[in-house]
Curated annotation (Swiss-Prot):
One of its GO terms (molecular function) is 4 iron, 4 sulfur cluster binding. The keyword Transmembrane does not apply. Its EC number is 7.1.1.-. This is NAD(P)H-quinone oxidoreductase subunit K, chloroplastic. NDH is composed of at least 16 different subunits, 5 of which are encoded in the nucleus. Belongs to the complex I 20 kDa subunit family. GO terms for biological process: aerobic respiration; electron transport coupled proton transport; photosynthesis, light reaction. Its cofactor is [4Fe-4S] cluster. The keyword GTP-binding does not apply. The gene is ndhK. Binds 1 [4Fe-4S] cluster. Keywords: 4Fe-4S, Chloroplast, Iron, Iron-sulfur, Membrane, Metal-binding, NAD, NADP, Plastid, Plastoquinone, Quinone, Thylakoid, Translocase, Transport. It comes from Carica papaya. It is found in: Plastid, Chloroplast thylakoid membrane. It is a peripheral membrane protein.
């Protein structure tokens, strides 16, 4: 049977049909409707107030802020992350459905910022707790920089393969008192591993006998005052 050609129909079909893969279609749907969970602990979070306004209007990127981690696929960490807040941050991240993404916003979130040298309670980088997709430096970053970070994340999502992303993620994370990143057996929960707690060699120790000698020399009246 001879095939019948329809030149006009063939030209119309070529101009109106888009061919793609299922992976590209999934990436396009995810990058066009990111629902962020705003996690702010310091001054960097104030910059989000400008994004909501009409001048920047981040709704045009499909961003719909959510108050529940179970409805979000993007978390923006802004501000200082302390040791006490680390378990809560990890818990929020684990409650987010896959696939999920993280933007670290500000110097304090990325490296600890000005608290990274002499603070005993600051996490030196949120990537010791959860995997980070985009680092956004600044103190604080401007709204234009936040939009640029979201644009770069959208480009990253458009080129990724979901199965490869799941295989490349690290599941076991831990950090010690001197903020060294280590891999451990158990899944990281944001708490310190008790087996890894030790006193850094650079910290000076007070002998026990000196402490009790000083304590006995102080009168009760001085302690009250």
């Amino acid at each position: 049977m001879n095939s019948i050609e329809f030149p006009l129909l063939d030209r119309t079909t070529q101009n109106s049909v888009i061919s793609t893969t299922l992976n590209d279609l999934s990436n396009w749907s995810r990058l066009s409707s990111l629902w962020p969970l705003l996690y702010g602990t310091s001054c960097c979070f104030i910059e989000f107030a400008s994004l909501i306004g009409s001048r920047f209007d981040f709704d045009r990127y499909g961003l719909v802020p959510r108050s529940s981690p179970r409805q979000a696929d993007l978390i923006l960490t802004a501000g200082t992350v302390t040791m006490k807040m680390a378990p809560s941050l990890v818990r929020l991240y684990e409650q987010m459905p896959e696939p999920k993404y993280v933007i670290a916003m500000g110097a304090c979130t990325i490296t600890g910022g000005m608290f990274s040298t002499d603070s005993y309670s600051t996490v030196r980088g949120v990537d010791k707790l959860i995997p980070v997709d985009v680092y956004l430096p600044g103190c604080p970053p401007k709204p234009e920089a936040v939009i640029d970070a979201i644009t770069k994340l959208r480009k990253k999502i458009s080129r990724e393969i979901y199965e490869d992303r799941i295989r490349s993620q690290q599941g076991n994370r831990c950090f010690t008192t001197n903020h060294k990143f280590l891999f451990v057996r158990s899944t990281h929960t944001g708490n310190y591993d008790q087996e890894l707690l030790y006193q850094p060699s650079s910290t000076s120790e007070i002998p026990t006998e000196t402490f009790f000698k000083y304590k006995s020399s102080v009168s009760s009246r001085e302690l009250v005052n």
